[in-house]
Amino acid sequence: MTNSRWAAELVEAVLEGRATEARALTRTVLDAGTPPEEILDGGLIPAMAEAGRRFEDQRFFLPELLFAARAMKEALALIKPLLAERDVPPQGRVVIGTVAGDLHDIGKNIVAAMLEGGGFAVHDLGVNVSAATFAEAVLEHDADLVGLSALLTTTMPVMKEVVEELRRRGVREKVRVLVGGAPLTESFAAEIGADGYAATAALAVDAAKRILAGEPNGDCESGAEGQSSGSDGGQGSGPSPVVTLSDAGRVPAPEPSSATPIGGPAVGTGVGPGADSLEPLSPRELVKAALDFRAPPRLPRQMWVLPWAQTRHPEELERIERDFPQDIITIPFACSEPVPGGGNAHAVGTFVDAWGCTFENLQDGIIGQVKAPRLADWSEAADLRFPRERLEVELEKVTAFCGGTDLFVLAGTCPRPFERLQFLRGSEALYLDLNRPPAELLELIRRLHAFYMEELTIWAKTEVDALTFMDDWGSQRALLVAPELWREIFKPLYADYVALAHRHGKHAFMHSDGHITEIIPDLIEIGLDALNSQVFCMGVEELGRRFAGEITFWGEMDRQQLLPRGTTAQIADAARRMRAAFHRNGGLIAQCEFGPGARPQNIYAIFEALDG
């Protein structure tokens, strides 16, 4: 087999995720006497470089990238020991990990794979890695580069601790520091003293090579710091931020019912066109006027309050609640039968939910990550127990609650099929499944959908005003999966939820994090009434230009950059931009999340600005 032929075949096998074939071909080429470094340089490095390019231009999504990385690792496992025997120097020695307090790892795992495929020797320290552990690993492995990943805004300061610890150990001058993660920016990297910032997992290899060569870290020139109309600080104009190192592993957001919307009396004054009376609007009618584009006298308000805010800022929270009473509330979940599971979902430690999924949490006030999938093997799927106790809703309590408030009431359940599949299967395993969906996955989706429809039907027959559902579908710059796959498998599920709500005279509300612009037309097509999404990730003005007047934007204010680090003036400016972009005699709800890292004065400033 000629060099050009085996190289082309190996590249193709890796890109198509044919792991067994990639390993077998590598063995054949090795047995023919080809040096391992030639296989690395001629096949694996070009394959992963092409995978990165396809990921960047959205020909690949997470399932395809993970499949390619898995095939590359199979081939690399054969040549790594041979490279060591021949003393072939790597491109560099890298220590990588997710910083202390953070359990997210998919993005970090992809970066590690990309670096290995780029010829680096990589020592992956895993997740929740302390500054001391990073420093010790640098010394142990004589590392040239440290890769730091974080997804939570509350763990970003740990990156600075790592830099300082390296300096304290006397190794900072010999090792370079590369950082990445969804909430990070190039300016943050400079602020903490890092040498570089990888805007995307696919660009991590080039970024690493540049900073090790002492060159400017040019990967950020793509516009990650350009502050587009939909990016962090609300300044300047340019492309939206690109997907970051750990972004692929973003934690699915807590169910809205697990955050605590604060409700209180609120009355609008006046009515919009088409109303029969000049009586003040109740909060419920105010929200309906916004949803129906009937010119409500002010924007409806809702604040999602996580326990983190309740324990750290009780006085400020009370002031916000007093000055800006909320119009929307999620009904407390009530079942006549005990629901399985145990522990506190927002406390440090482990929590088992009603489905038997075990979450690990390192920080009080937020929800943790599933680290022991319930369905590690598909053979266990037939025995999976669905929590039918959730169907025993105490209807009398629901009726009394809805009748006793003039707030707009959201149902006390929130189906999340994609995220439930991740919790059951494990995120990385599910992405691999989705690349070539096995029959077991499709059957589980069918069963899950039937259960959710049964649960939603119960709530649709109550007096609540809206049904809710959620799934986080975006990275920082694109969908997590190919739009075609989403439309084939998941869009029909959401269409059923919306149709069910409308048949019973309810509105349909959905939450989805990340850059989901590609599927918003689909959500409008199926009749979704309100969408909670990261509008600053996608571009406020662009979203308004394309979709204002067709769907209600249920918030939200930027919680990656503005809420934790912005000034009140920046918040006010961002709020004005949202109103200008989205409000068309309705179509905008003043919503934000008071969660980890958010400054209380910024939460106050949102409602103050949007009330004007």
Task: Specify the residue positions occupied by each region the protein language model found.
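A contiguous, low-structure linker/loop signature
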Residues: R70, G341-R385, G404-F408
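Active-site loop segments of alpha/beta catalytic cores
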Residues: G268, G272-R312, N361, D383-G612
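Glycine-rich phosphate-binding active-site loops on the catalytic face of alpha/beta enzymes
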Residues: Y197-R210, Q534-C537, L588-C592
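Cofactor-cradling patches in redox/metallo enzymes
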Residues: V111-G118, H123-A194, T200-K209
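Glycine-rich, proline-tolerant flexible connector loops at the mouths of alpha/beta enzymes
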Residues: G52-E64, A150-T153, F469-P483
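Glycine-rich active-site/cofactor-binding loop and its immediate structural neighborhood
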Residues: Q91-L125
